[in-house]
Amino acid sequence: MLKATRKQADPYKSKLKVSASHSGPHPLPVEVTAAEEEQAATFGQTSPQKLSLKGSQLGGSILIGNYNYLTQLEVCENEMEVLDLSSLAQLETLKCSRNKLMELIINGTNLQTLVADHNYLHNISTTNTHPVPLKLQRIDISHNNFSELPNWVGACASLTAINASHNRLNNVAVLLRNYRITELVSLDLAYNDLKQLDQFPEGFSSIRSLQLQSNELPSLPDNFFAVTHARLETLNVSCNKLSTLPRYEQNNHAALVNLSLAGNHLNDSIFEPLHNAAKLRVLHLAYNRIGVLPAACVRNWPELEILVLSGNMLQQLPEEVATLGQLRVLRCCNNLLLCTPQLAKLAMLKVLDLSHNHLDRVNLLALVPSRNLKYLDLSGNLQLQVDEQQFKVCQSQSQRHWSLVDVSGNNRAALPTTKIRQVSAQRNQNKTSGPWTMGFAETPGSGDCRKLSVYQLRAANYGGSDEALYGMFEALEGRGRAAQEMSHLVPDLMKQEQMVKDSAVRDYMKFTLLAAQQQCGSVRSAALFHLTRTRAPSKVRPLKSKRYVLRMASTGGLDAYLIRRTSQLRLTKPDVIQKDQIHSMPDPHVLELILSNDDEYLVVGNAQLWSVMDIDRAAREIRKEENSLLAAKRLVDIAQSFAAAESLSVIVVRFRHLGTDVDHLIRELKQSVRKKPQPVSLPLSSGSVCKRTCCDRSNACRHRAIEQEPLAGRSSPSGQSDRDLLAKDKDDEFVLAHARVLQEEQQLEMLDETESVSESVLSEEQFKCWEYMLEQNTQLLFDKELNTISKSFTKQRTVPNAIMAATVLPERNDFTSNLMRTVTNKFISTSTPQLPQPITTSVPLGSYHQVKQAPPGHFGSALSFQQAHSYGYNLFDAKPRPKFHGGTVKRSAGPNSAYFGSLQRLMPYNFEYDFAVTQERERNILDEEEHDDDDFNEHESRMRKYWGVATTEL
């Protein structure tokens, strides 16, 4: 083989001269120097037959001509945009992968192999003399932009393999209607947009492997099994929209060995065409709507080795499952199982997953095989009871140490032997109150189930409830112990690095990984993620200090993505190993990112996961599960149905409640104002069954259909505008509820970035103004109105004895003071006020009058408004204000005081008072507050700047 390459040391002595034109109409051809001609002549050749230009930095338009004897050409990993090979009539093998090709012209006279994956091609042109490459045997055009296959593909009679995955194909009519292929063995159309398949021609009977996963197919052709049953061994139709399989009554000698139907809408009717698939070894039926596994089918699958039934509605497994002597992997998580067969008879069973079912009691002696079982998962069965004596007997029979893994995050070291309802209730409470929840899944390769090659670090409470540390370490071949030791050593190392004050904030992550590799040895890949709270003040909203930050350090091929509401962000860099890094520790990639309400999930996976699944598919699957553990398990099951054969490891962190204290207050306000939807019973259609329990899966459950009443009209902050502006249909109100909440939270975050908001329709603008007032001026408005009340008491000539007696009442806590404790205390406590009630029924005119009625419903906590009694707080300038002792008290009226009347009907006070009397008192003391008019005008202009509305004083 004559390999012509370009030396970087001296470009003038290179054997190959290439001229590439980006803009010229006639690109210059590739030429060979005289030295190369002499070398070719010594071998008895007039021109080289094999030419490799891999990684030669070729760009632009390339025209290669005058090479009549060139048979093999490799131009991979360049930056070519146009490649014209129309003059190479003797070319047999062409490899042009990983370029930027948008146009490719080939000569199909003798072409046998065409590999053009990872480009931007949407068509491949041929010459007029040979429009169809009749000798073509293999074509790979995956990872391109094809919307349909080239029109000459179906006429290539010698084709044996077609790979057109990861394109934009919406149909393959060109291939099926003009089908002249006689020996096609493999067809890969996965990861496209196929919505329909026409009837298969008779020539399709030769196919053995058909990949159709991750498409939009609602059904397979009616003659599918009639044509393919004799030779088809591998069929993958996972993640489509199949509801049934085509029937074929004469399918007595089906050749199917590997069948993947995960992630569809299949029901119990699919087992009829699979009844006689006696050669079946691998069956993936996860995440469908299967309720019963027929015992007759199980008896006809004696060679079954892998059976995956996760995410269905199975209530029991047939006893015939215990007769599958070759079964190695059985996954039935996320079902409705109440009992299990005696699986201890399965001597070859190595992986058993029965998690997230309804199991209450398990007989380990009848369930667990004594010797070969490597992984047993019984987590998620909330009422599960295990006999501790049975556990000890099984452990002694296996003569091995059993490692217990608690997936709940409580780090329990023992099996649950009794029902613990309190722990379950506390666990559910933690799920709703924490800033994030974590789920993980890991499994060995399907070929070798002996050990894991990827180890995880899961420290959910690393430094407290709002701090976590996660990591993933992939071992080198035969060095799994180094990765395992690193996962145990990293937490202590990072605490030591955090104590170093001289280094940068995020450098402790980098040095932690380097120190771990120095002590434990090198690993193939490593990734470390630290979630913690930052208290850096915001520039626009000073109170918005409760922020969370994600810090990451990674090396190798582990990939991590941050899934947001409308996009996905890759956190790790592509794995590029340089020559100087082969025998040295690579420099970790460090990243620091402030989390926001738009961030939904953090997904970390090893290279095997991302080799069969992209982030778009992963995000789509994760959003189908509310439980983070089930989301991680779903990714692993889907990846295995996509033919992932090696070890898989996934960590899924679901973010929620990442907002600030003010955001939490606003969220609680919205929940108290809006009427909560009440569940209603709807008539169930035939076959509609609750797919999962309500705690695990709520998105597809028909029993959770709810209806919400329309909001009571509040079209303006003052509540005095027309209510018809907010009138909506009940169904529309519930359907758009989630989108409306997301939009409101996004508007809260926009206040950190800008000080201007675009104009909108009247009702939306008024709602924004009301929301802004609640967020920015809640504290200010409480102080202002309570000060007004206190001043009115101090100006009265006669004070009832009952009220004066209230001054000696004890304080409720250190941060709250009684309203009438002292006359000089002009600024009242900001906690929820509790005014004393007068004993006498006669109340003087102008004094405080309290109406006895049931207090309105509370929202949130009084701690949301508490501050020290010595200081007030101004939300506009973020500065504490000192307490005045005597003299004229400065009025604490904000720019939104005009809307305080409307707020009174929403704020859940513990007292009520007459608004007319309050307004009369306010007019009587205006002479003391004239010097605050300038401040009020300034704030009023600011309100106009933000929202374009005018304010009026009450």
From Swiss-Prot:
EC class: hydrolase
Q: Where are the LRR repeats?
A: 69-89, 90-104, 110-131, 135-156, 158-179, 183-202, 206-227, 231-252, 255-275, 279-300, 303-324, 326-347, 348-369, 372-393
Cofactor names from the entry are: Mn(2+)
Q: Which residues form a coiled coil?
A: none
PPM-type phosphatase domain mapped to chain residues:
437-655
Catalysed reactions, semicolon-separated: O-phospho-L-seryl-[protein] + H2O = L-seryl-[protein] + phosphate; O-phospho-L-threonyl-[protein] + H2O = L-threonyl-[protein] + phosphate
Alphabetical list of Pfam families matching this protein: LRR_1 (PF00560), LRR_8 (PF13855), PP2C (PF00481)
Keywords in alphabetical order = Apoptosis, Hydrolase, Leucine-rich repeat, Manganese, Metal-binding, Protein phosphatase, Repeat
A GO biological process held by the record: regulation of apoptotic process
Q: PROSITE patterns per the record?
A: LRR (PS51450), PPM_2 (PS51746)
Which InterPro entries does the UniProt entry name for this protein?
Leu-rich_rpt (IPR001611), Leu-rich_rpt_typical-subtyp (IPR003591), LRR_dom_sf (IPR032675), PPM-type-like_dom_sf (IPR036457), PPM-type_phosphatase-like_dom (IPR001932)
Q: Where are the transmembrane segments?
A: none
The EC designation for this entry is 3.1.3.16
Name the segments for region: Disordered.
Answer: 1-28
Give the protein's function.
Answer: Protein phosphatase that specifically mediates dephosphorylation of 'Ser-586' of Akt1, a protein that regulates the balance between cell survival and apoptosis through a cascade that primarily alters the function of transcription factors that regulate pro- and antiapoptotic genes. Dephosphorylation of 'Ser-586' of Akt1 triggers apoptosis and suppression of tumor growth.
Query: What name does this protein carry?
Result: Protein phosphatase PHLPP-like protein
What is the native source organism of this protein?
Drosophila melanogaster
Q: What is the lineage of its organism?
A: Eukaryota, Metazoa, Ecdysozoa, Arthropoda, Hexapoda
